[in-house]
Amino acid sequence: MTSIAEGLFKSLPKPKYTGEEEELPQHGQRGPRIVGPGQLDDTQIVLRRTGPPPYGNRAGWRPRAPEDFGDGGAFPEILVAQYPLDMGRKGTQSKSNALAVQVDAEGKVKYDAIARRGHSDDRIVHASFKDLIPLRQRVDMGEVSLDRPSEEEVQAQMEKTKNALASLVSGAVAAQKPKNVKGGSRAEPTFVRYTPANQMGDTSRKNDRIMKIVERQQDPMEPPKFKHKKIPRGPPSPPPPIMHSPPRKLTAEDQEAWKIPPPVSNWKNPKGYTVPLDKRLAADGRGLQDVSINDKFAQFAEALFTADRHAREEVRLRAQMQQRLAEKEKAQKEEHLRALAQKAREERSRAQSRASHSPSRGRSRSRSYSDASSRSRTPSEDEEAARERERIRRERRQDAERQLRQSRMGTERRIQAMAREQNRDISEKVALGLAKPTQSSETMWDSRLFNQTSGLSTGFNEDNPYDKPLFAAQDAINSIYRPKPQADFDDEADAEGEMSKIQKSNRFEVLGRAKEGFRGAADAEERSGPVQFEKDTADPFGIDSMIADVTGGAGGAGQKRYGIQEAEPDSRGSKRARVDEEN
């Protein structure tokens, strides 16, 4: 067991502090140490020297304490602030707020020094709880004497107060008295004892006399007897010696360097001298100035040029990209419209082929039909004809309403409407006033004539002061085919005659190979009148019409309509057809 304890103690480090009293090391001791002569070394003896060090050993030395100056003054070769005998030094009172710790007779810290800071010693400062207790209730009441003072103390205090008041009053009165009036105050008389001496051999005894010496009375109104003269100022202290180099003769270079040109003004020449330009430039001092241009200007200009070039390149690339996107979008739109047109032509051709196999209804709507032919029609054909007439009336009414709205629109609204509807023929553009014909040579002017003085004001073309005709679009409107509103012809002969006249006119041959026609136009059915646009039907396969026919045949006549529900185009078809026939 002991071997284990010894091994454990050996493994532990040596403790720094123990509970026993031990000697502190030399560096931890404070204060003077008493050593024997054997422990003292010559290298440890340091003698304190007063006064400045000898010459040659003053490198880095600065006088700080009064002992450093010795019995002399400041050292001029040391360029620091020096105060021998503290002459010229400002008050050494510290500006710090730190206070020295003070204790009372009992060894307690006197914290009232904080409250007394900045006050005089005779000022009463209450800084403890004891000062708040009345004198009669204090514990040390017996130590304070409250007896009446004696007569001697009262007289001494009264005399002291009287003298203090008299000094204050006399000072105030003396300040009000004039200072330059004579005889204002007379000195007290002086008494002198006079004993006469022996004169002329007289040896008799002489009596002493008491003489009173009084200051002579002065007239306060007497003018001054002497005139005050100002004493001239004495000679000043001799000037300090100035060390000059020995005189030497000036060389030609020195004379040229010291040659100062006379002042030459650029605005005044009262004497009228003729000063050459080189002398003016020499007097101006421009040759002495070194003009230098900073390189930053060139760098800044180059940076601006590079930034501008990059910006223009970015704008160009952006514009090209936008143009490509617009062209691509336009091509897609044209392709879509072309596909729709092709689809419409194919549907129209199929409808034409189906209509050719079915019995023809005829194109004429004349009133010469007989009652026998009308009676021979089946009810289904009459209803179909009435439905077709109702559709045509509805389209005409919509066209009339659209034309009325367009006539009330402004030019900007017309342009916006045309932008929304790009796929319109030239007749509608002419109706809107957007198709401008090419001006003839008579209405075109040379722009160079407008810059000359000879013009309308000098009698040129006085009869026609307008550069454009008033109705520029009227010629284009008259030259473009516009079908008449009443497109219904009386008979087939009139329709065939109108068609033959249009075919013989050959109006559009100037535009190209018009006889061959356009691609897909041969499959389209013949058209009489203006181009009629077809709307997308909600029922392309005819399912709704088939259901309507079935429901109409079963009990459609007995259906009841509510509110503003429109009547079915199939209902009362026979009556509408009969009315149209009567008309």
Swiss-Prot record:
It comes from the Eukaryota. GO terms for cellular component: post-mRNA release spliceosomal complex; Prp19 complex. The keyword Nucleus applies. Residues 203-225, 325-350, 386-424, 519-538, 569-583 have a biased composition (Basic and acidic residues). Keywords: mRNA processing, mRNA splicing, Nucleus, Spliceosome. Transmembrane segments: none annotated. GO terms for molecular function: molecular adaptor activity; RNA binding. One of its GO terms (biological process) is mRNA splicing, via spliceosome. Pfam families: SKIP_SNW. Residues 367-377 have a biased composition (Low complexity). The keyword Nucleus applies. Residues 1-68, 177-253, 321-424, 519-583 are annotated as: Disordered. It is found in: Nucleus. Its main location: nucleus. InterPro entries: SKI-int_prot_SKIP, SKI-int_prot_SKIP_SNW-dom. Residues 233-244 have a biased composition (Pro residues). Belongs to the SNW family. Associated with the spliceosome. Involved in pre-mRNA splicing. This is Pre-mRNA-processing protein 45. The gene is prp45.
